[in-house]
Amino acid sequence: MTNYIAALVDELYQLGVREAVISPGSRSTPLSVLFCEYGFQVYVGIDERSAGFFALGIAKEKERPVVLVCSSGSAVAHYFPAIVEAKHSHVPLIVLTADRPPELRQVGAPQTIDQIKFYHDYAKYFEELALPEEREGMYRYVRGVMRKAYVSSLDQGYGVAHINIPLREPLSPDLDGVDFTAGRLDYPFAWKTGEKGLTMDSSVFQDKKGIIICGGDPYADYHREVLELAERLKAPLLADPLANFRNDDHPLIMDCYDAFLKSDAVKVELKPEFIIHFGQTPVSKRLQNFTAMHQDVLYFQVNDYFQYRDPSLSISRYLVASPKAFARSVKVHNTDDGYSGRWQHYQARMRRRLNLAQDEEELFEGKLVQKLQDSLPEGSRLFVANSMAIRDVDYFLEARRQRIKVLGNRGANGIDGTVSTALGVATSGHPTVLLTGDLAFFHDLNGLLIGKNHGLNLIIVLLNNNGGAIFKYLPQSENKYFELLFMTPHGMDFSGLKTLYDLTYYEPVDYESFAQNFQEALTLSGVKVLNVKIDARLSKELHDRLTNLD
């Protein structure tokens, strides 16, 4: 527990917090002791109500967040009047409430109340910490929560961030073994907004090896500026399929990094010195693992507004600024293209490997994505379901000069609402195609009624592997209940949809009939379903073979 809480305390200090107002209590012992041990300016207020307003006064005068610390139970409630005032007078406070661990809640344990979102909308931000664990990943995690709390107390109007902290006994920290540096990044986290984000010292990119990550962003208007930035920095641009940078064949655009980053040796060889990240979290889990592997790298996230997207717990600079304006503001011109050349080498090798899918005769998702890309009219919308469909697009959708827009629901990454969302996209009047697996399709079958009732035009390419084949790629595949709980074969006959929803239905049996059906579907009105049956076992074998560098 000691170093977990020590990392929390240190991160707040690194962010610029200097004052802690502490209300005495037992459950908050590790927090109180370690704030004192670190050297914060500590004030003790016996009455929590008074302590809350005292902290409010400090924050008003200092114009920076002040920490409030209390024990569990009714102590939490006594801060409420000050928190109400902080909300309405826009004063930054970070409230740390100690709590009983889960096993002592709802069982009559003393000084235990429901502290989850206790301050309701009076707090701008709430999060409950995980129980303390003494390991590196958890130290980085707790630091990340403090960053979110700190920025939330300042961003878009000052206010209150509330962090609830469950703690188990023993509660006294080990002051002899405490390490306040646990989980620190090599570059302390910094948050800049507006003009400050555009006046940063861009010499940090001079003669450095770096990459640009472009995650999904349906509203992106910065493609040209970011490509020009990549050219100036000689930085490979890792283009998530939903970022829509793959509408260009620029040699710096990487479109199959998820495959070659499977290799640990390649991940080590391609270590960057900086990362610039635009847009959402990428689809590629291997890319997230790559950034997590290189914690000592200067990692910038650039966004129009603050939304902490950092599953790899690696970000060291958050710039709230227009991506377009930021890209223009970096005037550095690097000359050495050796680093980007190594990325291009693996990109070319992997793309040749993935394109071997064209030689396959059996129906396979990878080749179907390639055929689909060849067949989409200019200006098309390709809506891609989650689970395996988006991963197949990530692998097999090649960067080339074309004009299509790829969309998906990567906010919560669920499979629900897939058909309905695609139909909403289809109201644009652009040719619209939904690429989906069978479970995502089944999950939202009733969405087809909207298409029928409103006469919408949508082509649905249904990759039907009879269940949750994505789990074949995960550790659950070894479980003895795999078929029952994860693969969930359904054996459904979707042909009845033709009558039920008055749609056009196809069951292509090979690539020739798929191409014919697809071209015909482009000429027809209404909803058209191409049910392509896939052998899940063969598909897994082909994925494994084609996504290996060797």
From Swiss-Prot:
SUPFAM superfamilies: DHS-like NAD/FAD-binding domain, Thiamin diphosphate-binding fold (THDP-binding). Its EC number is 2.2.1.9. Pathway: Quinol/quinone metabolism; 1,4-dihydroxy-2-naphthoate biosynthesis; 1,4-dihydroxy-2-naphthoate from chorismate: step 2/7; Quinol/quinone metabolism; menaquinone biosynthesis. Keywords: Magnesium, Manganese, Menaquinone biosynthesis, Metal-binding, Thiamine pyrophosphate, Transferase. Its cofactor is Mg(2+); Mn(2+); thiamine diphosphate. CDD domains: TPP_PYR_MenD, TPP_SHCHC_synthase. It catalyses: isochorismate + 2-oxoglutarate + H(+) = 5-enolpyruvoyl-6-hydroxy-2-succinyl-cyclohex-3-ene-1-carboxylate + CO2. The keyword Metal-binding applies. Pfam families: TPP_enzyme_C (PF02775), TPP_enzyme_M_2 (PF16582), TPP_enzyme_N (PF02776). Binds 1 thiamine pyrophosphate per subunit. The keyword Aminoacyl-tRNA synthetase does not apply. Coiled coil: none annotated. One of its GO terms (molecular function) is thiamine pyrophosphate binding. GO terms for biological process: menaquinone biosynthetic process. It is an enzyme of class 2 (transferase). Catalyzes the thiamine diphosphate-dependent decarboxylation of 2-oxoglutarate and the subsequent addition of the resulting succinic semialdehyde-thiamine pyrophosphate anion to isochorismate to yield 2-succinyl-5-enolpyruvyl-6-hydroxy-3-cyclohexene-1-carboxylate (SEPHCHC). Homodimer. HAMAP family: MenD. Belongs to the TPP enzyme family. MenD subfamily. This is 2-succinyl-5-enolpyruvyl-6-hydroxy-3-cyclohexene-1-carboxylate synthase. It comes from Desulfitobacterium hafniense (strain Y51). The gene is menD.
